[in-house]
């Protein structure tokens, strides 16, 4: 039975569990839920809400999108082995009152204290608008006072959606402002707190996430069959949640992700696009507390026995994955003589460098004290190692010309600031010349 929304106000505590469900015929009478969600609701995770003997039963308070609260039974099938968990008595009435249909998606979240909030997505994969949400104003730019009611859509990641993913036509029509339809770049805020720039493609079939989308999925361990839920924050900025094949929310914080996040927090220097001088006695990167050191990608040498193969020394890279994304490299003898510079795979993958391409390096040159400036650019070939690490290399075709034109010497430090995957601004910190 529905009740007053204020009745749920006493529930406190952070969200404990989330689950996504697709409504099947059996879901309208009794909706199955995950063991994790059931354990929270039934007090089996140490919150003191567990029952006594027999199969545990407990009523959850389900808050509908229109602000009403429904009492719904939570229980397990009594089959002698714990049984499957479900939302039972009261759920059928909730489903009927909200007009839920076959193939709809339901996202439930436990807010604590037995209170469940519900989001409903119809067969267009867009958040269902009941038109009666209290105290919420939502605009085409996606701004809303209540974050849960901002425009949202979800997609099941079928194999064809890994390379590029179509944004639902209904979502584009209702929630993408007209002035944004000709913008070719969106931003996604990952669960790790980093913004990723994703290229937008538009054709007669609609609007798609494309350039950088596959790299975003790969970096976060998002796989075919997962479901992505994107919430529009406005101005083509999206927040994302991911659910696994079992419907449970995925934790995307891998070991590598945490390392990168910690590295980014320790970077206090924002690179500029000017050429500066540095003390020749100072060591590269000593102004940065967290230096990342990588082994350069292997350079194929002669296989003839007894012939020495010349290999680069280990070089230090300090980088941040953004935006803005940037990486610093100290110029070595090897880079100048062999015309090859190696960049770490994690950095390359994060900006979308996953295949052979050409990168434009650009330097801005200011003219004296005036505000006028000019820019020069060089095209440099880039290869990507297919050895699993994804290291990329700026090749002699273009890199040597760049070094010669800018008079680079051993000890100089180049900061490459990524504007787009294949367009980088370069700032040069020159070692003092004797």
UniProtKB/Swiss-Prot annotation:
Entry superkingdom: Eukaryota
SMART domains assigned: B3 (SM01019)
Main location as per UniProt: nucleus
Gene3D superfamilies in alphabetical order: DNA-binding pseudobarrel domain
GO cellular component terms, semicolon-separated: nucleus
Compartments it resides in: Nucleus
Alphabetized CDD domains for the sequence: B3_DNA (cd10017)
MF terms (GO), sorted A to Z: DNA binding
DNA-binding region: 27-124, 150-246, 326-432
Keywords: DNA-binding, Nucleus, Repeat, Transcription, Transcription regulation
PROSITE patterns: B3
PANTHER family: B3 DOMAIN-CONTAINING PROTEIN REM-LIKE 3-RELATED, B3 DOMAIN-CONTAINING PROTEIN REM14-RELATED
Stated name of the protein: Putative B3 domain-containing protein Os04g0347400
Organism of this sequence: Oryza sativa subsp. japonica (Rice)
Highest classification ranks of the organism: Eukaryota, Viridiplantae, Streptophyta, Embryophyta, Tracheophyta
């Amino acid at each position: 039975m529905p009740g007053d929304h204020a009745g749920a106000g006493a529930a406190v505590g952070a969200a404990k569990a989330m689950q996504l469900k697709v409504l099947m015929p059996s879901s309208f009478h009794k909706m199955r839920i995950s063991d994790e969600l059931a354990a929270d609701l039934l007090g089996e995770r140490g919150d003191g809400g567990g029952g006594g003997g027999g199969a545990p039963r407990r009523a959850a308070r389900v808050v509908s999108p229109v602000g009403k609260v429904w009492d719904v039974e939570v229980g397990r099938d009594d089959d002698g082995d714990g049984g499957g968990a479900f939302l039972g008595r009261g759920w059928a009435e909730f489903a009927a009152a909200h007009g839920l249909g076959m193939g709809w998606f339901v996202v439930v979240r436990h807010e604590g204290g037995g209170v469940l909030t519900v989001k409903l997505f119809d067969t267009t994969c867009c958040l269902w608008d009941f038109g009666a949400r209290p105290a919420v104003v939502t605009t085409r730019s996606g701004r809303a006072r209540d974050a849960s009611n901002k425009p949202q859509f979800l997609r099941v990641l079928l194999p064809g959606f890994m390379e590029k993913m179509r944004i639902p036509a209904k979502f584009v029509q209702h929630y993408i402002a007209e002035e944004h339809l000709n913008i070719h770049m969106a931003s996604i805020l990952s669960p790790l707190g980093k913004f990723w720039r994703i290229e937008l493609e538009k054709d007669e079939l609609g609007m798609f996430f494309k350039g950088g989308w596959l790299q975003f999925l790969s970096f976060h361990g998002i796989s075919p069959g997962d479901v992505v839920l994107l919430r529009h924050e406005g101005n083509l900025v999206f927040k994302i949640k991911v659910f696994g094949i079992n419907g449970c929310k995925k934790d995307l914080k891998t070991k590598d992700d945490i390392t990168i996040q910690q590295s980014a927090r320790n970077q206090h220097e924002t690179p500029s696009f000017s050429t500066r001088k540095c003390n020749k006695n100072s060591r590269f990167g000593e102004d940065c507390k967290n230096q990342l050191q990588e082994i350069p990608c292997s350079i194929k040498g002669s296989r003839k026995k007894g012939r020495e193969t010349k290999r680069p020394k280990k070089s230090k890279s300090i980088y941040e994955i953004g935006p803005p994304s940037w990486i610093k490299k100290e110029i070595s003898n090897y880079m100048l003589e062999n015309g090859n510079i190696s960049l770490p795979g994690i950095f390359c993958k994060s900006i979308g460098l996953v295949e052979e391409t050409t990168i434009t390096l650009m330097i801005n040159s200011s003219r004296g004290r005036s505000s006028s400036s000019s820019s020069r650019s060089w095209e440099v070939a880039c290869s990507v190692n297919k050895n699993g690490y994804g290291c990329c290399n700026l090749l002699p075709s273009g890199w040597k010309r760049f070094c010669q034109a800018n008079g680079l010497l051993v000890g100089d430090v180049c900061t490459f600031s990524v504007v787009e995957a294949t367009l980088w601004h370069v700032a040069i910190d020159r070692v003092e010349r004797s």
